[in-house]
Amino acid sequence: MSNAHHDAFDKATKAGFIIALGIVYGDIGTSPLYTMQSLVDNQGGLSQVSEAFILGSVSLIIWTLTLITTIKYVLIALKADNHHEGGIFSLFTLVRRMSRWLIIPAMLGGATLLSDGALTPAVTVTSAIEGLKAVPELSSIYQNQTNVILTTLLILMVLFGLQRFGTGVIGKLFGPVMLVWFSVLGISGLLNSLQHLEILKAINPYYALHLLVSPENHRGIFILGSIFLATTGAEALYSDLGHVGRGNIYASWPFVKVCIILSYCGQAAWILAHKDSGIALNPFFASVPEGLRVYLVILATLAAIIASQALISGSFTLVSEAMRLKIFPLFKITYPGANLGQLYIPVINWSLFAVTSCTVLYFRTSAHMEAAYGLAITITMLMTTILLAYYLIKEGVKPLLASLLMAFFAFIEFIFFLASAVKFMHGGYVVVVLALAIVFVMVIWHAGTVIVAKYVKSLSLNDYKHQIKLLRDDLRFDLYQTNVVYLTNRMKKDLIDRSILYSILDKRPKRAQVYWFVNVRVTDEPYTATYKVDMLGTDYIVCVELYLGFRMPQTVPRYLRTIVQDLMESGRLPKQVQDYTITPGREVGDFRFVIIEERVSHARQLSTLERFVMQTKASIKHVTASPMRWFGLQYSEATVEVVPLLLSDVLKLPIKEIKACTKDEKA
């Protein structure tokens, strides 16, 4: 990576500052919508709130944002960039060679982050729409929760429906809208805080620690389940590192943090002033003058949509990275914009919409959603902490120091996990079940890949290239294709899967001028596109190692065109002049791509567990994208050949021949 590119990544600009506000902080920036309301509701309402409770709650929020978001994520995790990309899978690619078991926290963290993404749009949009209850002109309509639900579902349907068109145009508005949002949070919070300056005492961590053991706190340590809502967007902050650059996050986070803290302080000041009034409104909206509430609801709805959009886009990126790391099934990906980073996965989009809509219908109110929210993300944060410990050791930090530092954060996050665990019985099981389902799919997919690698045998192309040459020149066989391209997941030097040679020589001899063997390797760098070629001293066998970054589309035909051109220009591959063509001077013949698909038959060598894994993976494949689409072959001539996983394993069933009786035997 060039120094100029590295400097740009660490540099802050005015435009980058605005863009960061729109992309990075949607989740954490909308937390003030529901965090204080959750604290008050779980305490038993305004009448049960005391000054010590409010001071302690705000202090807990301030120090959670400081320790988890600022120190762990902004100051430490942002340093762990994989060629300027962030997120749990990027972090995993940096440390995966240090220990094989690290794939476990990567899978758990990715699954819980993805399941959390299904709940975030539901809780943020519902909280914003419920703000209409505080608008006198509309309160009569929206006191009926059914109207809140219908409005929320309509917004979500439009939001998910627009994903296929990309966010290139509307995305430019995200930054300015969020700038206005954070400014309003800060200004309104400051104005309310000036009415009760004693709220500023919450900066002292004493009030946070005191509240945890105070009898005025009715929930004890479980209050942290509500406090954690204030920092749920910290993981998304790290995941979006590649979109905006480290410098812009460093520059924008202080502004965002101050505005968020002022908002919490302002809501707390309003609560102190009205704790005996019996008002049953969300402190976020109630702390603003009645005449301005409708505008705040509109702004809050826009902010909630932006936060939801960030989570949806983040889910697409997360799934695409998992697919390229071969720990998730392949699904169709499209790129609605000119930017490779702007992608769309239809199956994931509509699955998220279904889960989000069901969440709204099942929980009905934001209060019930908040009771279930946050449990999954505590697990994600714990998994990130484990991977960060290995990263620090890899970067030269003494193992003891790295372990102690990460143990400190792990302890805090584990306490949050325990405090949030009570949410399991209040709806948290929905997210947990969803996360476990995703983990199950990941484990099956990865284990299936390991099993195939264990049993599939390889043969040397050098041992068979003479046979291939004889086949190429054997005119008794019709020309199958000028170029036959075999896509393989496993190729090392001249070693390829036996099933490929079986397809060429045994199944039905395939005569061609050139035999291509292409292996796509996913690199740790996100945007790599390089290749290596070994022709084994021939002009009719081409072994291609195609190195693509984990964020690059694996459209093989597009890359192969360039490789063919390079080989012909360098004289390593004979030109294939075409006598009949509509393209004058065409020197490249036709291509046929062949994909070998291993299937489990009655494989006696497989254990019961291995057979279950392979059969389950085969079942999952029925609802995933075909290799044709994944490798961009839908517009090319391509064939999928099915072969048994173990070619030599032929199940012999007992059977006896019935011999015809002779005349003597009949007599």
Curated annotation (Swiss-Prot):
Keyword Plastid found: no
Catalysis: reaction(s): K(+)(in) + H(+)(in) = K(+)(out) + H(+)(out)
Record membrane topology: Multi-pass membrane protein
Chief location bin: membrane
Compartment(s) where it occurs, according to its Swiss-Prot or TrEMBL record: Cell membrane
Keywords, comma-separated and alphabetical: Cell membrane, Ion transport, Membrane, Potassium, Potassium transport, Symport, Transmembrane, Transmembrane helix, Transport
Superkingdom of the organism of origin: Bacteria
Gene Ontology molecular function terms on file: potassium ion transmembrane transporter activity; symporter activity
InterPro entries associated with the record: K+_transporter, K_trans_C, K_trans_N, Kup
Keyword Membrane included in the entry's annotation: yes
One Gene Ontology cellular component: plasma membrane
Ranges annotated as spanning the membrane: 16-36, 58-78, 101-121, 146-166, 167-187, 221-241, 253-273, 294-314, 343-363, 373-393, 399-419, 431-451
Stated family: Belongs to the HAK/KUP transporter (TC 2.A.72) family.
Protein function: Transport of potassium into the cell. Likely operates as a K(+):H(+) symporter.
HAMAP family: Kup
Protein name, UniProt field: Probable potassium transport system protein Kup
Provenance organism: Streptococcus equi subsp. zooepidemicus (strain MGCS10565)
